[in-house]
């Protein structure tokens, strides 16, 4: 029997690992990097230097890196090994976090094979021995007020969760080739605004019904929660002009964009910019 979206989301957090959320903890949440094979379909390629600069910043400042799924594009590409070869510098940076026990990777719909594929896991083994990929993760509030639930967010859609093999086939053999000719995939929440809004509404509703703060990726639309809507989205690393993420520090959330800017003397530099006011966890309502 097909589960409804709310049950699929609850299942994502069954036996999910927990991390402490204290005033001293620092987490940075990225999602939807879609690292590819370095070809014309590799949407991550144009932002790889921004991503590298951001990772170096967060490593230097003591953040724990959490990736909320779709880190690698494994619908359009079959080989995780090829992706790691092309983006070796990126994975070397991630491995630094892993060696210091500061890296956690979730899977989304586009890299869902990490859930069970021994071959995909094997590609990670040299740099990330005994790595585990999770469907969800919970930041447990040490002040016993409001926990933060992290997952990819594809669970609201039947074709991106239960029927993902069908959707992967369509992306690989239909929408992928058409995208190279300028057509957008109408089944994608990242490219279809109507589907994007429906997904966001379902995720917000789930967060309210379950009395938690929910942070996902999937739609590629960055957003920070409000007092009445305890749902946030990290955005993605495939925007044309930058990458976005959410920083968590002092039990507060900050939506950040990394981009290339120009100084008056025409020197290019990487900038880190807040996209919205920082909001603290105690400012977000929960409904239970």
Show where each model-derived region lies:
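Binuclear metal-dependent phosphoesterase catalytic core
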Residues: 229-288
């Amino acid at each position: 029997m097909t589960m409804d979206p709310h049950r699929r989301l609850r299942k994502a957090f069954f036996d999910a690992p927990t991390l402490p959320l204290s005033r001293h903890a620092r987490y940075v949440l990225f999602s939807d990097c879609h690292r590819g094979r370095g070809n014309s379909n590799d949407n991550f390629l144009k932002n790889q230097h921004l991503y590298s600069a951001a990772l170096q910043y967060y490593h230097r400042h003591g953040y724990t890196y959490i990736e909320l799924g779709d880190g690698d594009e494994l619908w359009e590409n079959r080989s995780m090994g090829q992706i790691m070869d092309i983006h070796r510098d990126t994975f070397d940076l991630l491995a630094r976090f892993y060696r210091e026990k500061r890296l956690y990777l979730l899977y989304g719909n586009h890299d869902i094979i990490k859930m069970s594929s021994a071959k995909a896991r094997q590609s990670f083994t040299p740099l990330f021995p005994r790595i585990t990929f999770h469907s969800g993760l919970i930041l447990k509030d040490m002040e016993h007020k409001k926990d933060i639930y992290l997952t990819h967010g594809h669970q609201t859609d039947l074709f991106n969760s239960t029927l993902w093999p069908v959707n992967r086939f369509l992306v690989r053999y239909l929408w992928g080739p058409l995208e190279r000719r300028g057509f957008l995939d109408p089944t994608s929440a990242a490219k279809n605004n109507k589907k994007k809004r429906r997904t966001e509404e379902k995720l917000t509703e789930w967060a309210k019904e379950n009395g938690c703060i929910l942070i996902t990726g999937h739609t590629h639309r960055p957003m920070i929660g409000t007092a009445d809507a305890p749902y946030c989205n990290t955005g993605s690393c495939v925007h044309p002009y930058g990458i976005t993420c959410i920083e968590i520090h002092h039990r507060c959330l900050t939506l950040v964009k990394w981009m290339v800017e120009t100084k008056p003397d025409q020197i290019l530099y990487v900038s880190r910019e807040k996209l919205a006011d920082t909001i603290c966890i105690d400012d977000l309502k929960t409904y239970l």
